[in-house]
Amino acid sequence: MKKKMTACEIIQETYNYYAKDPERRSVIRNTGNCLYNYEGRHCAIGRCLSLKWRKQDIMFRGNTSNISDMVLKNDYAEIGREDLTLNDMLMPRYRGHIDDLWEDIQNLHDNCRYWDMPNNRVTTDGHGRFETMMRNWEGV
């Protein structure tokens, strides 16, 4: 099993993943909406979910407030596991962080100001946001 990642390691990995090819973002072109899983792509949180959850054919918009919807529609809730959390749904190496980290990472993914899609690159604002996140989450 891979070691648990720090907040900054997760931020760096996420930034590198989408900076290499912003088309990997799980965004519907004509609406700009983000979905956890869309046409083989995953949002920032969706990318870190365990295989069971990544395989869900659920078209939720990609933000942490919708995780509760995802939990309510799964078999854990049906067998009395209403206490399931985002942390439970993540691959083990991503577990152990507060939801605020995931909101921050998801917002990096979602914000169109951070991605120059016609030129397939990160914008100056996007890189600045990444640097701010790295400072804010250092040591966590």
Language-model features: locations:
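Catalytic phosphate/metal-binding cores of nucleic-acid and nucleotide-processing enzymes, i.e., regions
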Residues: 2-5, 17, 21-34, 48, ...
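Active-site nucleotide-donor binding segment shared across nucleotidyl transfer reactions
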Residues: 37
